[in-house]
């Protein structure tokens, strides 16, 4: 499944610089707000769903090379976090929906964890 499909179907807002998502295809998903759990459980090329919006999410996402981070519940990263994400090629997306709802929608679209 293409990342652009997920963005369109869930009505996600792209927070970082727009890039061509046409070749990005997440292979799995992971949901957690505890960074140590994310580092242990999230997979390369996956989607990470969290309500965290602080600068450390960029470091973790870059370390794991996730496809994108979906920030839920209208949590908004500050401009410095977005700038850091841009410089590290980390895609940040946002939604007013809860993490539970987002994960259910992604599951409904057919994306599964490995």
Label the model's feature ranges.
Residues 1-19:
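N-terminal, charge-rich interaction modules
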Residues 27-29:
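Structured beta-strand/loop patches that form or line metal/cofactor-binding pockets in enzymes
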